[in-house]
Every structure is written in C-alpha cells, then in structure tokens.
Design a protein with these regions (language model features):
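Short, solvent-exposed recognition patches
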Residues: 1-95
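Surface-exposed amphipathic alpha-helical segments
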Residues: 95-125
Length: 125
C-alpha cells in the first residue's frame, strides 16, 4: 500500500504512530496535538477501491456538498454540531484507485486545505 500523509497539519499536530492501522488495502492515520493533548484528533484514512469495497458515512446531522480536491471529485460533510461529530471530507483518486477521507473538528477551509496537502511519501514497491 502506498504511504500518504497530510503535509499541512495545524500547529502542534503530528502522527501518533502507535495508532496507525495498515493492511493490504487500507491505511488509517491518527494525528494528535502535542501542544494541546485534549484537542480532538485528526484522522486520515485511505482505501483501495475494489469490488466489494464499501464506504460508510453517517450523515444524520451534516450538511453535504460536492467538492473538488486537487481536481478530484469528492464530498464535504459539515457537522451541524461539532461538539458531537467531526467534519469529514472524502475524495477519490481514480488514477490510483484510492478513496481518501479526513475527519476533523476544524472549519471547512482548514479541512479542505489539509485535503489538498495530502501527498505521497512512499510508493508501493
């Protein structure tokens, strides 16, 4: 699985490597704020899109809008109450057959900025 990361994290955030989940088809990364340990985490997940893959997003208390991340189509789920749930942005890289998502209790502009900063750091061998 190729390795991606968010390169434009808010101040104080860094990967908590003890929480990384990696398998053949999925990677989940948790970022924690070392300057403010009680701050909510940021999550980056990506998965290979293949037959039988399902992405589940709870939308009960969210406003959904179409969005573009670096030319790729996706959706932005803005929570109506961020004290209860995160904002989420998802997009699909059809060239590499990957679906990405970021979950964070941050503004629309901040989460979009992070999504646009996701970069490949290590290709699959």
């Amino acid at each position: 699985m190729p390795q991606y990361e968010i390169t434009a994290l808010p101040d104080g955030y860094e990967e908590d490597s003890s929480q990384r989940i990696a398998s053949v088809n999925y990677v989940g990364i948790e970022y924690r704020n070392k300057l403010a340990p009680d701050a909510p985490p940021i999550y980056l997940d990506y998965i290979y899109m293949q037959q039988g893959t399902v992405y589940d997003q709870v939308t009960d208390d969210a406003t959904i809008s179409d969005i573009t991340v670096n030319g790729m189509t996706g959706y932005l789920y803005l929570s109506k109450d961020m004290s209860k749930s995160d904002n989420t942005i998802t997009w699909i890289d059809t060239e590499h057959n990957l679906q990405f998502s970021i979950d964070a209790r941050l503004s629309e502009s901040s989460i979009l900025h992070m999504a646009e900063s996701v970069a490949l750091v290590e290709a699959t061998k």
